[in-house]
Amino acid sequence: MSHAADMIRTHPEDLTGPDADVLAAAIDACFDCAQTCTACADACLGEDMVAELRHCIRTDLDCAAVCLATGQVLSRRTGHTTDVLRTLVEACLAICRSCADECRGHAEMHEHCRVCAEACERCVAACEALLATL
């Protein structure tokens, strides 16, 4: 069980909302994707062809920022309306799709882009599962 799942399970308030396991999986996927996108951007900066990776770097950094914010808000189960959560998760889903597509375009040349695309795709799947419960 992840720390996110432990925190949901041990929260002192009986909060209604999305399924705890689905929520924990989305939180974990968001934070994993944020870290992976940050590392991918840094790896792109280390490549000789860094100028050609400029768009990828920017997309990685945008995705990392949105995933981090989404994971943080989902972790705070303090009265957010479903509409706000849905909008945030939809934004996360959109940037993760965009980043996965961008990184897939470089995956054959740069292993770090393949890894990043996979993390983004896992986050997309987790966000889709969470949206189905909201």
Predicted regions span which residues?
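Amphipathic alpha-helical hairpins
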Residues: 1-134
